[in-house]
Regions:
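N-terminal DNA-binding module of tyrosine recombinases/phage integrases
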Residues: 1-18
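Non-catalytic DNA-binding core/recognition domains of DNA-processing enzymes
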Residues: 16-91
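C-terminal/domain-terminus segments
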Residues: 52-56, 210, 217-225, 314-320
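Flexible interdomain linker/hinge and immediately adjacent N-terminus
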Residues: 59-63, 67-68, 87-116, 199
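Basic, Lys/Arg- and aromatic-enriched nucleic-acid-binding interface segment
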Residues: 110-138, 283-284, 291-297
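Short, charged phosphate-coordinating catalytic segments
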Residues: 131-187
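C-terminal catalytic core of Y-nucleophile DNA break-rejoin enzymes
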Residues: 168-176, 199-223, 227-248
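Short basic/aromatic active-site micro-motif
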Residues: 234-298, 306-311
Length: 320
């Protein structure tokens, strides 16, 4: 089941991805929620002593969790965790169907939370500025070292070196490396933080531009940290990292977004025959009517370490 470091793309091609977990963080999350299920079975059905015999209680447990008011994202996580363990795929008739996730019901980093009362913004000012200027996840903040800062000049030098390799002689890893490096051409910033493979979500590698009015302070901290030392030895558990990523995402979107009226009408709706803007994203649900620039959303998505613009629209960009 554990396939850390393996290529998920190749596993999908070979049809072996359903039985594998490619990210250690995903494994930890799944195991955490599976243990909740185990505890439930042990307490309610003490005569059930094996995971095989406990399988019949999966849907009962998930129904209980939904009745208790668990959020839709948590329900999806628990259903996936137990589905992965027992080999129950989402298209299986026995797979528990969690409630749909709606943007308007997301509470994470929306408004004040109890934990905010235990977090001093003044004492953690540098951390907050660092997060808002880099958009890193908590796991990435915990992992980056002094050696993980790089300039656009150095990135372009590596691109030039790799492009000298004849295309017919380039390996798949070289082509992938080139794609990652070339993503930095979407940005104008000179300094980037290198998120190495295996650190971020899904193990994806990327270069996040350092942006905003506190960029110099962030760069200075990175440069002042020895190459083999962590930039942040301690990150307050109550720091709202997701909220700071939202600020970072919104800043990048605003820097690259075109005025909606300036985006060309470049396609025709087959049903109505009316001209349409293919590069305009139409928000849904509680934000219906809002329009966003798809090109700017993609740039924002790359900086955050995502590959889907709808994730950016639903979870990060705000206040527009």
């Amino acid at each position: 089941m554990q396939a850390f470091g393996e290529s998920k793309k190749e596993a999908v091609k070979s049809g072996t991805d359903k039985e594998k977990i490619f990210s250690f963080n995903t494994y930890k999350s799944y195991w955490k929620h599976i243990k909740y299920f185990i505890k439930y079975v042990q307490e309610k059905y003490p005569k059930c002593t094996t995971m095989k015999s406990a399988k019949k209680y999966v849907n009962e447990w998930l129904q209980k969790r939904e009745t208790e008011g668990m959020s839709a994202p948590t329900m999806h996580l628990e259903a996936k965790a137990l589905g992965k363990y027992y080999g129950i795929s989402p298209d299986d008739e026995n797979y528990y169907k969690p409630p749909k996730r709606h943007r308007e019901n997301i509470t994470r980093s929306r408004g004040d939370a109890v934990r905010d009362k235990h977090f001093s913004k003044a004492n953690n000012d540098e951390l907050i500025k660092f997060c808002k200027g880099t958009g890193l996840r908590r796991c990435e903040l915990n992992a980056i070292k002094g050696c993980d800062i790089i300039t656009k000049t150095d990135i372009e030098a590596e691109i030039s070196k790799l492009e000298k390799i004849p295309e017919e002689k380039r390996t798949e890893s070289v082509e992938k490396r080139l794609d990652i490096l070339k993503d930095t051409r979407l940005f104008d910033e000179e300094y980037y933080i290198h998120i190495r493979r295996g650190i971020g979500k899904g193990g994806r590698e990327r270069y996040s531009p350092i942006v905003g009015k506190n960029a110099d302070q962030i760069i200075e901290r990175m440069k002042d940290t020895p190459n083999n030392k962590k930039v942040w030895e301690h990150i307050h558990s109550c720091a709202d990292i997701h909220s700071y990523r939202g600020d970072y995402a919104t800043m990048i979107y605003k820097a690259h977004a075109r005025d909606i009226k300036d985006i060309p009408y470049d396609t025709i709706n087959r049903g109505t025959g009316r001209k349409m803007q293919s590069e305009v994203y139409h928000c849904k649900k509680d934000e219906v009517g809002k329009k966003l620039d798809k090109a700017a959303m993609l740039i924002c998505s790359k900086a955050l370490g995502h590959n889907r613009i709808d994730v950016v629209a639903n979870n990060y960009i705000r206040g527009l």
